[in-house]
Amino acid sequence: MGYFSLIIVITIISFLNAEGIDSQELPIGLTDFEKNNINLLLEMGRETSPPNQPVRNIAEFERMSGVLVRYPLGVSLDIIRELAEDVIVYCLVSSAQQNTALNAFNNNDINMGNIQFIVGPTDSYWTRDYGPWWVVDGNKEVGIVDFTYNRPRLNDNNAPFKTSEYLDVPYYSVDMIHCGGNYMTDGRGIGASSHLVYEENDLESENIDSLMNIYYGIDTYHVVEDPNDTYIDH
């Protein structure tokens, strides 16, 4: 897989009147059930060997060739149409809803030549939070590095692995609870998150910093108070 043959996980914004949005979607925050069963996160973790060193975590602003969304959508079909004019739209969709997604895209004049379905169940459309992060390993090979999604949503948590299987790229996972919305990197070894990453893991901060270095190539990890002071802490 070439260096630029990557996916950027776009931030999903919920528009109240956007076409194709399912009103029954799980919220970005925890539901009451999830709050009462947060211990399920401990059963979702997986760990692999880290990528060959040195590792470089690819920044979201770098050149990409595709985007990752999920159906039912969290963005309008108009946005999907615009995206599909220029890049491949990889769409996570359950087998039960694949035909519905196909019909919705066809009926809205979307370029189906740039639509690829990754089939499997998901729990929500917050792909920016649970989707894959990309690295280049010491052999200059592009792969996915995953964490345990900080919501007890097993199907969402499995999305990065399903993506790696579909694209046939290496998959690595660190047994650490995290959230894509609470992480960003400059692509040159510097990363940043809110203090939530320290609070959600039963690990010393030094251990978390070390895992970020080994799996993501982050040499300088800025963990700060949530500057927005929001309930989701990122």
Predicted regions and their residues:
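Bacterial Sec-dependent N-terminal signal peptides
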Residues: 1-23
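The feature marks the mature, well-folded catalytic cores of soluble enzymes
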Residues: 19-234
